[in-house]
Structure formats: structure tokens, C-alpha cells
UniProtKB/Swiss-Prot annotation:
This is Major DNA-binding protein. Residues 1109-1132 are annotated as: Disordered. GO terms for molecular function: single-stranded DNA binding. The gene is DBP. GO terms for biological process: DNA replication.
Length: 1132
């Protein structure tokens, strides 16, 4: 939504490109090596634009840059700097720190040939700038400095073409962090030459002699920026894309057609659609490409303030580090945390890196030969995975097919070429991705470990196609083998899927169970003082706050952190505390319902409630990572194309093309299209912008006299600087929403995924207080030496031997009866289907379950879940990157022995990022996190004015290799919970600086083990500790002890249970136990036998319900099991 009132801002008159000359200091190079994109054989390093690291503290991110000289007046344009800078000189030592991943440059070139992408060609007539002379001119020794260039978005084409003129006479001494540096301005060649002489293919003598042209820098820009933009826009002619951008900025060509005459249409020939539908698709494709390219420039050439994360010295991990070694360790940890998000973008087939194909997916309900309308066309268009179309024939501007000359044919499996394509064939980007792949978990699907071992043994033959046997321990070939089971499948059919993206979250979020329902609007709060009439809306939060006030008053929850603080001294104390809390919750629910009636709040408001959060769309939100900046540009371009579909579909249907040339038709229609699109998507529910007005459009400035400088004289003169555009729109955020109540169809109440069937759970360890029973087991039963899991198993079987000192039997009976009672009471009303892991979640779920059930809601809700990144250590045998040399092993055993020797010699276990369940979802946003999620941009027509609005629907993350937490537990359990859960993956920056689809046929070993662990606790056994059974199953095919992170996964995130099992497992390891059979485990722990011993009688409690429980963590349900296979369960 555009702001109602314009924000007045100011910006200095300054050039939009600077060369920075740094001293070549070891500590600076160390920091840059972690934060930058670099490749061992590429001299250019892509680094983040950060204050006190690469630019000075008071660096202006937005400037009015002089662009045209009219004699007595200089015309200026607003532009903001790119969030990255490019080190181009003195980088030999820096790139030498990069890990060797093989010949990535050759791989990228092969990829371009295979998928018909343009390669950079060095202009033979251009003179290369003399860097040594430039350094000497500012008093620096070229061999002792390292140089980078920071460039505005509008200047990137000028920088690529060598059309920027350095002015060493205006050098400035600046302090960047701890280093004294020199920066040199780069002025646009348009100030010195006429527009007619500014071109990519030719230049004047002045530009030839003075222009800042470096082929290596231009090549990096060609791939990192322009090829990336081209693949996102389905525009393969990268040179024409650069030329169009150059003319657009220097000649104000936003409202003219620039790309269409040179565009080819990829991914259309392979779609099984009619000729008419192909025509519609090509016309829409040309429109959205042109509109998006024009508008992305307008948004990026706008006013943006530096974000909070742009000041390197203010990062907590930097400020709190006392030594350089500590700083480097923290930065490396940050890089590993970010690998969680990179993994999603690489392994998800619906990632923003792949989904550039515009597909026509006909509506199955559409009648044959029916008249095409805007609504029908819009509903049929979707962006989807493009990997299967990269070698297809293409259509040209005249709608004639151009045969593909590729001999490779279609790929059935994801390869290194596809990975290079996703990285826009930029070696620096590809090297960064491979570094991360080498440090990601291996998902075993039966023989993955053996495949890795065999690969390493075969490396001794020096036949690797990527590194020729020079660095197989870290090369891309080994990385692809390691994560082979996790790589995305190449889709055979087009399908509508959400787009997976990584963005920086904003603080605002309404993500509790009922989201927007019962929230007091800000406008209403302002009106209270003006009008005291009793017409206020329901304030649901007031009643939830009353419960938390009760908890704080009774010392149950920490008032600051929200953590559990209550102390349980006995069973009676436990019953008293929980009973009092549930009574308080039920009273607040009653008051809330009374208030709902008093305010005449209809039940429909609950059904229509929305959960929502915002993500930052300013260019500097992800400035800390050049990889995320690369992905950010793809997100903005794709979203703009998606929004442009509304205008394009209506225009194409109303004004179809009757000639052969698409570009000629577009030239005729473009003024109308541009004007309609310019404001069509603002204030429409998804894309939020702000309107800014520059304070002064005319300034008297001391500026370089361009005419004299061209003749060899440096003179500054006072001249009038006039701004071309005074008011503009700036990107602010996206609004992402979710509907908790399923309203996807009229038969939603019959949907098996949301239908709540009658359950008869009798085991408290599967219910709402399980986290408390595990946590306080030692205090509830201080003299019992068996685990919580085994004790409650024996309670269920009425088989607790009297040799166990459980305390007063009558008190125990009362306690057990209460535990069963609250579990069954909660289960009867539970439609949220979230098992609490802390007291605050228990309160939230109990309150809303009680509230909704009292109002007659019975079906399950859609719930939001978070997975946050954490660092864990791993077994080094699956991480060949720990090797210090090229593998030369004759057998697998020799490799394993060598790695064990490395560990004994002190080589640390590799640290990688893993994902764990976030117990309190809302903290993801209050902690200002980087979030990765799926987005479906829905469009709907307003009945009032027939305008189209957008709904940014939170979607799922595709693929079975993204993370094991995202995959369903087991197809045999018939548990549809994963169909109702939407997940966001997050890294909380406050501490260190998330959908599900149907199961694929692949099943990883860890998931098999998890299914068996849960199966163990579903089947009653006598005299065997369930924890011992779990240990036996987990260790069945393992040689090494699982980590706590692994155990949490196996027991579905129950931390107390995992800790109890790990305690036993650590004891076994300390005793050097190798036999993990049940018999041996029982002998080690001297399991309590109850065959002959007398037992306590709890039969009267267990007989209160007719249906008997059949498990510990999950009991049998009475609903009819469906025979529908898991592969048929499509994500809603």
C-alpha cells in the first residue's frame, strides 16, 4: 500500500560509483573470505556493502547522481547503491583462501553451451584501465593494496561497458573500520559525451583513454547480475538486456519497448496446449517481461536508507568478540546458519532459483472451445519449474519455431549443469553453493553412505571430470554425490506450486492461532478519546493476557523471557498448579464469549480470520550476504511479473495480436499497458510501498567542469543541478497471509485432512501435559529409578511392581486419574493439533481450543510452525572436506581408518547447520529473522468495483530432500497432520546476527528409523523398557552414537524424552558397550522384572474408559483407516 502522505527525504548530489583503495591487511582479507563470493580462478570477489567493512560509516546509500550536462545545468537522477561491491585488484591472496571446487569456469561454460545462454566476450578494441597508474596517482603502491568498486543500480550497465570516468583529482581520504582508505569518484561518460556516442559496441577517444574498463569485472557483472536477470525474465540475449538497461537509465526509456524485438519464448513448445493458447501465452510473456524490467529499475533507482544490519561494527557477534579468532569463528558460524536457507533454495523444486517458466495450465472444468476471458486466462497462467524446458525449441518474435541445436537431449536427473544454471553460470556464486553443499547432512536412502565411500576410493584414479583428481575431497563432483539423494527432481509435467524464497522478516506479525480475529485496530484506539460510545470491537488479547498475568502472579512463567519457572515439589502440588491454571483459562474463555456477544461479534469473523506477517523488500535487507542479494533480485523480478499477469491477461484478451510480430503489437499497446500497470497493484493487499518526495529538486553545487576535464584541465564550478524526478515509489514489504480455517471448497467439512474423528487417548504422555510429565519426572517420582516412558507404560498395563517406590498409592491414583482426565478433556476439544512443549504454548492452545469448541467448531485448523537453524557437530567420515589432501585410498576401510586417525590427531568434528522445531512461533518475528517460505500469489476480483486484488498465501516447500523435519513421519500411521501444517524456516538474527507436499517415493534411512521408533511406543510390551527398545532400534545399523539433534528428530522433538534416552546411551558408550541387542541392554541396566513380583493395582482407573489405550506416545484411534496411498495425498 502506498502511504497516504508522501515522505519528504533528502539526498546528496554525488556520483553513484566509487573506487575504494584498501591496505592489504591479513585480518581484513580473513573477514572478506568468509562473507564474500569468490572462486579460486576468478580475480573478482563479490563482497557485501557494509559500513565499517567495505565503505565508511557515513556512506550515502542514495544519491542524486549527475547524468547529463546541458551547459549551464546538470541533470541528476536518484539512484541507490547495489548491496554488493566488487574487489577487482590485489585479490590474489584473498582468492587463494577459497576452497578448491574443481574447474567451475569450464563447467559454467559447458552449461551456457548446453542451455543456450550467452557468454561474455571481451571487446577487442577497448583499452583496459591501468590499475597501477591509478594507484600511483593517489599515492598508493599497487602491490600493497586491494581495490573494490561500489556502484549504484543505475550505473551497473555503465560500469560493465567501461563508461565511467575516474577522477583522481577528487580522491577522498576516508576511515573504513580500522583502515585508512582512499576513494575515487567515477563519473558517468554521459557527462562528457553526447547520448548518440554512448554505446556498448563503440566508444569515443576520450572514453577509450580514460574509461574505467576491466574485462574481469565486466565478466562478473555479466553473469552475477545480467544473466541472472535474463534467466528470471526468460530473456536469453544478455547483451541486449544490458543495452536496454543502459538506454533506460540514460535516456529515460522506462515507457518504451526494449526487450521484445530480441526476445525468444522458451518453455512453450513442450507444453501440450492449443495454438491459440500458445499465442496467448507468448503475448502475456512479452508483456510481463517488458513491464517488470521497466518497473524494477524504477524501484531500485529510488530512495532507501541503510538497514540496521549494514553497520558491520554494530553486529553483536563482532562487538562481543575480543579477538580476531573469535570474530572469525562467529562469522563462520553465521555462514553455516545461512546454509539452512541455501539448502532450501537448492533442494526445493519450487525454489525461486528454478521457477522462471511461464506455463499455461488449462482449467479442467473449462469447456472445450470456450471463449477465453481474462479470468479464465489469469487462472490458467502460472510460474513453475523451468529445468525440464532448458533444451527445448524456442519461438522467435514472429512466432516461428527455432530448432534447438543441442545434442544432449532432455535431462532426467538433476546434474551439476543444472546447479550452475541456478547460479546464473557465475563461478563465484557456484563456488559458494558448493562450499555449503560440502557441509550439509547426507540423507541415506539405502546406499548413500556406500556411494560416498566408493566415490572417494575411485578418486585415486584421478578421473574426476571436474577437478582431474586434484581436489576430490572438496570438488563439486564429491558435493553432488554427497547430496545426491536430496537434489530436486526435474518435473515431467507443469504444475502450480508456491514459490520458495528467502527474505528478511519485519517485526510486525499476527501469527497466533486466530491471527487477526479479536485484535483491536490502531484506528479504534485513536478514536477512544474522541468518542466514548460503547461500540468497540472484541479484544481477544485482553483475556489471554489475563491468563499470563495469573501465571506471572503465581510464578509459573518468567515475566521477561516467558520461560517456565514454576517449581513442582510433589504430585499434589502438580495437580493443584495445573488445575488452578486450567480453571483460570476456562473462566477467561467464558468472559471472552460474553464479551463477544456484548460487542455483537459474529461467528463468521472467526472463520474469516487471517494470520499474517511482513517481509522486508528493501534492497539492503539482505545486504550481509551477496548470495541472498542475488536471490533478492530474482524474487522482486518474479513478483513483479506475477503482478503484471493481471494487466497482461486483460489486455491480451481484449486486444489480441492479429499480425505475426509480437514486438510490433507490443509497441502499439505499451503506453496503455504501462500506464495501467503503474498503479494497478498498489493498495491491493500484498505489495506495500511508500511514496517519497525529494526535498529539493534544484541545487547549486560545486561540480566538476566536464568540458574542461575532457580537455585535460581539472576545475570545479558552481552549477545548477536539477533533479529529473521529484516523487517516486519505494519498496517496503510483502504481506504474507494464511487462513487458519479451511475454506478451499464447499465440501471442506468432508475433507479427511481436516476432519477430526473421535479419539480415545488414555495415555498422558501423548497429550497436552506430556512435556511437564517428562520435565518433572524426577520430582514427581523421586525414588523411581526407571524412565518416565517406562513408568507410564507400566501404569497403562497396570503392571507397576511394588519393588518400585512410587510413593503413597492413593496419592498416585489421584495423580494418575488427574493426568488421564486433563488429557482426555483436552483431546476432546483439540482442533489445533499442536502438542505443547512449554507452558505458554499450553495456555495458548488450551484457551483457543476451549473457545472454539464452545462456539461449535469441530474440524482441524491449519497451523503455522517454525524450524530454526542451529549448529551441530557431525561424524567426519561423511564429510570428505576434512581431508587435508586429495583422496588416495585403495579401500573403504583404509578411508575410515584414516579419518579416525585424523580425529585422534585433534581434527575437530565438522560443524553444520541443522533445523529444530521452534516452540514459540511468534518469536521468529520478534527476533528479526531471515525466513524461507513458500508463497502463492492469489488474485481475486472485488465484487464492488471489479478491480483485482492480491492475496499472498503462505504455501509449502516442495521436495523430500529439503529437510527431514518437513517429511511425513510414516505412511502407515495415516497421520494427516503434515497436510495441515505450514512451515517457515528461520534464522534468528537477534542471537546470531518453514508446507509440505505429498511424499515422494524416496524414503531416507533416518525417516525409517523414526517411523520404527514411533512404532515401538505404539505396541505394548511387558517387562521391557521402551527406551531400551528405542536404543536398540536406533543403534541397529549404526557404528557411531547419534547426536542429540538426531535423537530429537527420532522422538519428534520431545526434548525430555530425547535427553533421557541420550543419558542411557552415553552410559553405554562410557562402558564401551558394542552389543545393543535387547538382551544385553537389559542385562546392563538390570531391568526390573514384574513376572513374579507383586504389582500395584490401578485397574479401577484404567477401567473408567471402555476403550483401552494401545501405546505410549500415540494410542489407537477409532476412525476408519483410509486405504488411500501416501502418493495420492496432494498438498492442499
Amino acid at each position: 500500500m502506498a502511504d497516504e502522505n508522501e515522505t519528504v527525504v533528502s539526498a546528496p548530489v554525488s556520483t553513484a560509483a566509487w573506487i575504494y583503495v584498501f591496505p592489504k591487511e591479513k585480518e581484513l582479507l580473513d573477514v572478506l573470505s568468509v562473507l564474500s563470493l569468490m572462486e579460486r580462478n576468478s580475480p573478482v570477489v563479490i563482497s557485501p556493502l557494509l559500513m565499517n567493512l567495505t565503505v565508511e560509516n557515513d556512506f550515502s546509500t542514495t544519491v542524486k547522481t549527475p547524468i547529463t550536462n546541458f551547459g549551464g545545468t546538470i541533470l541528476t537522477k536518484i539512484t541507490s547503491f547495489m548491496p554488493v561491491c566488487f574487489f577487482f585488484h590485489g585479490t590474489e591472496q584473498l582468492v587463494g583462501m577459497a576452497e578448491d571446487h574443481g574447474d567451475l569456469i569450464r563447467l559454467c561454460e559447458q552449461t551456457r553451451q548446453k542451455f543456450h545462454l550467452q557468454s561474455f566476450e571481451v571487446p577487442t578494441a577497448r583499452k583496459v584501465i591501468d590499475i597501477k597508474a591509478l594507484c600511483s596517482a593517489v599515492g598508493k603502491d599497487a602491490d600493497s593494496v586491494i581495490c573494490h568498486v561500489a556502484c549504484g543500480n543505475g550505473f551497473k550497465e555503465l560500469l560493465f561497458a567501461g563508461l565511467l570516468i575516474p577522477c583522481v583529482e577528487e580522491q577522498i581520504q576516508v576511515q573504513v573500520g580500522e583502515y585508512s582508505c582512499v576513494k575515487i569518484p567515477l563519473y558517468s561518460a554521459t557527462l562528457f559525451e553526447t547520448e548518440e556516442t554512448i554505446s556498448l559496441s563503440s566508444c569515443t577517444e576520450f572514453i577509450q583513454e580514460r574509461g574505467f574498463f576491466l574485462p574481469a569485472l565486466s565478466e562478473t557483472l555479466f553473469y552475477y547480475v545480467f544473466t541472472s536477470w535474463g534467466t528470471t525474465l526468460r530473456f536469453s540475449n544478455t547483451k541486449e538486456l544490458i543495452d536496454a538497461g543502459l538506454k533506460q537509465f540514460t535516456q529515460d526509456g522506462e515507457q518504451t519497448v526494449k526487450l521484445a524485438p530480441h526476445k525468444t519464448y522458451l518453455g512453450i513448445s513442450g507444453q501440450k496446449i492449443s495454438a491459440v493458447e500458445k499465442d496467448f501465452l507468448m503475448l502475456v510473456d512479452s508483456v510481463v517481461t517488458e513491464l517488470s524490467f521497466s518497473h524494477v529499475a524504477e524501484y531500485l533507482d529510488s530512495v532507501y536508507d541503510p538497514s540496521q544490519i549494514m553497520n558491520f561494527n554494530d553486529w553483536p557477534i563482532i562487538r562481543n568478540s575480543e579477538t580476531h579468532a573469535e570474530r572469525m569463528a562467529q562469522l563462520t558460524n553465521l555462514k553455516l546458519h545461512l546454509s539452512s536457507h541455501l539448502a532450501v533454495l537448492i533442494f526445493a523444486p519450487n525454489s525461486i532459483l528454478y521457477c522462471s517458466k511461464l506455463a499455461f495450465i488449462p482449467n479442467v472444468k473449462q469447456a472445450f472451445n470456450s471463449v477465453m476471458t481474462q479470468e479464465l486466462l489469469l487462472r490458467s497462467l502460472s510460474f513453475c519449474n523451468a529445468l525440464s524446458s532448458l533444451t527445448e525449441d524456442v519461438y522467435n518474435d514472429n512466432r516461428k519455431i527455432i530448432k534447438c541445436d543441442s545434442t544432449s537431449g532432455k535431462d532426467d536427473k538433476f546434474s551439476a549443469n543444472h546447479l550452475a544454471y541456478a547460479c546464473a553460470t557465475c563461478p563465484q556464486l557456484l563456488s559458494y553453493v558448493v562450499w555449503n553443499l560440502n557441509r550439509m547432512s547426507v540423507y541415506n536412502a539405502g546406499n548413500a553412505y556406500t556411494e560416498i565411500y566408493n566415490h572417494l576410493v575411485n578418486c585415486s584414479a584421478n578421473l574426476c571430470e571436474f577437478c582431474d583428481g586434484k581436489c576430490c575431497q572438496s570438488c563439486i563432483g564429491t558435493a553432488m554425490v554427497r547430496v545426491g539423494t536430496r537434489l530436486p527432481a526435474i518435473p515431467k509435467n507443469v504444475k502450480k506450486e508456491p514459490l520458495v524464497m528467502s527474505m528478511f522478516s519485519r517485526y510486525y506479525a499476527e501469527v497466533d492461532i486466530l491471527g487477526s480475529f479479536g485484535r483491536k485496530p490502531v484506528s479504534e484506539l485513536k478514536e477512544i478519546g474522541k468518542d466514548q460510545q460503547n461500540t468497540l470491537s472484541l479484544d481477544r488479547g485482553k483475556f489471554v493476557s489475563q491468563i499470563f498475568d495469573y501465571c506471572k502472579k503465581n510464578s509459573l512463567i518468567d515475566p521477561v523471557t516467558g520461560e517456565d519457572t514454576f517449581n513442582v515439589r510433589s504430585k499434589k502440588d502438580f495437580v493443584s498448579i495445573i488445575h488452578g491454571l486450567t480453571q483460570c483459562i476456562e473462566e477467561c474463555v467464558s468472559r471472552c464469549i460474553v464479551e463477544m456477544r456484548r460487542t455483537q461479534t459474529p461467528r463468521e469473523q472467526i472463520e474469516n480470520c487471517l494470520q499474517s506477517f511482513n517481509v522486508d523488500t528493501t534492497p539492503y535487507a539482505t545486504a550481509f550476504s551477496p548470495f541472498l542479494t542475488f536471490a533478492y533480485y530474482k524474487v522482486i523480478l518474479t513478483v513483479l511479473q506475477n503482478l503484471a499477469l493481471i494487466v497482461a491477461s486483460g489486455h491480451v484478451v481484449d486486444r489480441p495480436c492479429t499480425g505475426n510480430s509480437i514486438s510490433k503489437w507490443l509497441v502499439q499497446q505499451y503506453q496503455s499497458l504501462y500506464g495501467t500497470f503503474h498503479s494497478s497493484y498498489l493498495k491491493k493487499g500484498f505489495l506495500n510501498t511508500r511514496t517519497v518526495k525529494v526535498a529539493s529538486n534544484v541545487d547549486m553545487e560545486q561540480i566538476l567542469d566536464c568540458d574542461l576535464y575532457k580537455s585535460g584541465k581539472y576545475v570545479k564550478t558552481t552549477i545548477q543541478a536539477k533533479l529529473c524526478r521529484l516523487s517516486m515509489q519505494c519498496l517496503r514489504d510483502f504481506r504474507i497471509k494464511n487462513r487458519p480455517f479451511n475454506k478451499s471448497s464447499k465440501t471442506a467439512h468432508n475433507n479427511p485432512y481436516f476432519k477430526k474423528n473421535v479419539k480415545h487417548k488414555k495415555n498422558p504422555l501423548s497429550g497436552c501435559i506430556s512435556f511437564l510429565l517428562f520435565k518433572y519426572h524426577d520430582k514427581l517420582f523421586p525414588n523411581v529409578k526407571i524412565s518416565c516412558l517406562e513408568l507410564w507404560q507400566r501404569f497403562l498395563l497396570n503392571n507397576v511392581p511394588k519393588t518400585l517406590d512410587i510413593g503413597n498409592p492413593e496419592e498416585v491414583k489421584t495423580f494418575i486419574k488427574f493426568a488421564f482426565s486433563i488429557t482426555n478433556t483436552y483431546d476432546e476439544i483439540d482442533i489445533i493439533d499442536i502438542q505443547p512443549e512449554c507452558l505458554s504454548t499450553f495456555i495458548d492452545c488450551y484457551f483457543h481450543n476451549k473457545f472454539l469448541s464452545a462456539l461449535g467448531f469441530h474440524d482441524y485448523l491449519t497451523s503455522l510452525h517454525g524450524l530454526t537453524s542451529k549448529l551441530v557437530t557431525q561424524n567426519p567420515v561423511l564429510f570428505p572436506v576434512v581431508l587435508d589432501k586429495q583422496p588416495k585410498f585403495s579401500s573403504i576401510q583404509e578411508y575410515l581408518v584414516y579419518v579416525k586417525k585424523l580425529v585422534l590427531d585433534g581434527v575437530p568434528n565438522p560443524v553444520i547447520a541443522s533445523l529444530s522445531k521452534e516452540p514459540n512461533f511468534g518469536t521468529i518475528f520478534t527476533s528479526r529473522s531471515l525466513v524461507t517460505f513458500g508463497l502463492t500469489l492469489e488474485k481475486f476480483v472485488s465484487l464492488a468495483n471489479r478491480e483485482y486484488f492480491q492475496f499472498g498465501q503462505l504455501g509449502w516447500i516442495g521436495g523430500s530432500g529439503v529437510d527431514r523435519n518437513l517429511n511425513p513421519t510414516s505412511s502407515a500411521l495415516q497421520d494427516f497432520r503434515f497436510m495441515r501444517q505450514k512451515t517457515i524456516i528461520a534464522t534468528k538474527f537477534s542471537e546470531v546476527i518453514v508446507k509440505k507436499v505429498r511424499r515422494e517415493t524416496i524414503m531416507f534411512d533416518t525417516e525409517v528409523v523414526k517411523g520404527k521408533v514411533l512404532s515401538i511406543v505404539e505396541n505394548l510390551t511387558n517387562d521391557i523398557d521402551p527406551e531400551l527398545l528405542i536404543i536398540a532400534e536406533v543403534m541397529r545399523d549404526r557404528e557411531d552414537k547419534p547426536t542429540m539433534d538426531d535423537m530429537l528428530f527420532f522422538v519428534d522433538g520431545r526434548e525430555a524424552l530425547a535427553a533421557s534416552i541420550m543419558l542411557k546411551l552415553n552410559h553405554l558408550v562410557d562402558m564401551n558397550v558394542r552389543d545393543f541387542s535387547i538382551a544385553n541392554l537389559q542385562s546392563v541396566f538390570e531391568a526390573v522384572s514384574s513376572n513374579d513380583a507383586p504389582v500395584y493395582d490401578f485397574s479401577e482407573i484404567l477401567a473408567e474408559e471402555d476403550d483401552q489405550a494401545s501405546g505410549v506416545l500415540k494410542c489407537d484411534e477409532t476412525e476408519t483407516e483410509t486405504d488411500e496411498p501416501m502418493t495420492k495425498k496432494n498438498r492442499l
